[in-house]
From Swiss-Prot:
Transmembrane segments: none annotated. DNA polymerase III contains a core (composed of alpha, epsilon and theta chains) that associates with a tau subunit. This core dimerizes to form the POLIII' complex. PolIII' associates with the gamma complex (composed of gamma, delta, delta', psi and chi chains) and with the beta chain to form the complete DNA polymerase III complex. The keyword Chaperone does not apply. This is DNA polymerase III subunit delta'. Its EC number is 2.7.7.7. Keywords: DNA replication, DNA-directed DNA polymerase, Nucleotidyltransferase, Transferase. It comes from Haemophilus influenzae (strain ATCC 51907 / DSM 11121 / KW20 / Rd). GO terms for cellular component: DNA polymerase III complex. It comes from the Bacteria. SUPFAM superfamilies: P-loop containing nucleoside triphosphate hydrolases, post-AAA+ oligomerization domain-like. One of its GO terms (molecular function) is DNA binding.
Amino acid sequence: MTALYPWLMPIYHQIAQTFDEGLGHHAVLIKADSGLGVESLFNALAQKIMCVAQGDKPCGQCHSCHLMQAHSHPDYHELSPINGKDIGVDQVRDINEMVAQHAQQNGNKVVYVQGAERLTEAAANALLKTLEEPRPNTYFLLQADSSASLLATIYSRCQVWNLSVPNEEIAFEWLKSKSAVENQEILTALAMNLGRPLLALETLQEGFIEQRKNFLRQFWVFYRRRSPLELLPLFDKERYVQQVDWILAFLSDCLKHKLEIDSHRQVADLGRGIEQFSDEQTALGLLQAIKIMQKVRSDLLTINGVNVELMLLDGLTRLVTEVFETQ
């Protein structure tokens, strides 16, 4: 079976038990944040469902297990966004035709829908028709972002599971086994990534804590000098969205400090800077700053063909004119 992270074992066993008891649902929807390794959970569930032994875990010995291990099982299918964009209706129709046929291995059929929130309306409706009339021994495993919205009719046809971030102790111990850093650095990485262990591990491995600290120091210089053109060259072409996220986390923590909210702080290691910046802003000003940078982030992810530097410059200029100079 695909190796599972420790925080995924409980939900795996819960879902697996429903199949062991003959109560496995034909459409299982799992909503989860990125950075939790949920793909391995879906792989493990698919392997279990396809295994002819039908034990708590896939046996790893039957022909079906061997096909799954070789990624060549003819009755296992995947649906995912094309080029990271949408899942189109033609993709769903092709899958519908495949699952309508008899299983080539005379066992179960599984369809893994990765990024179900990316289904176009036509694709969602085409999938709905299949979910409304489930075929024997055919199972759909749907993955969606925790904040995503899907058609209510698709929800109603699925058994829905919500996967939350693991408790800090589990995440901390796992990270400690994977990295040779100080405990406080692990806690900082977890806070930066809202408790998501895989993103925290990447943060530790890539040195993002120090990079973020240096970048936010330059953001402070930009704030003092009101100089967008000084900060603009410091955005990395490979991770400008991540750098926008660092600014958003800083602004969000400033607003929380202003409102005396202590939970879910992402930049707790920069406490003095948070206090000073928030003391110089109004709550409404901080909220407006967050809205501006959220729009920048959204535009960077969704608008093609527009110069990235222009979008960043527009956002930074708006921070100056609509927030900093109005305080």
